[in-house]
Swiss-Prot record:
Regions that span the bilayer: none
UniProt similarity note: Belongs to the avian keratin family.
GO CC, any one term: intermediate filament
Coiled-coil intervals, chain numbering: none
Name under which the protein is recorded: Feather keratin 1
């Protein structure tokens, strides 16, 4: 850091070394770099929720699905997916592609 005096001479040098004017010393500006501290930001994660599905097992499921399948509003087979029920219902009729 370099400094220099801004004092002016006090005029003729008196017997006593004194001066009535203020003496100022000015130095160059200093630069300071302040690094910001790291900031931790917590973002909320996704909220995952699950809903239990109603499931049924055994013959009740096959009977329910079997009663949904129908032709002309009449269930194909109310007892499940038996081949005998399909054959008696479609005897003499043309089957449509799936």
């Amino acid at each position: 850091m370099s400094c220099f005096d801004l004092c002016r001479p006090c005029g003729p040098t008196p017997l006593a070394n004194s001066c009535n004017e203020p003496c100022v010393r000015q130095c160059q500006d200093s630069r300071v770099v302040i690094q910001p501290s790291p900031v931790v930001v917590t973002l909320p994660g996704p909220i995952l929720s699950s809903f239990p599905q109603n499931t049924a097992a055994g013959s009740s499921t096959s009977a329910a699905v079997g009663s949904i399948l129908s032709e002309e509003g009449v269930p194909i087979s109310s007892g499940g997916f038996g081949i005998s029920g399909l054959g008696s219902r479609f005897s003499g009729r043309r089957c449509l592609p799936c």
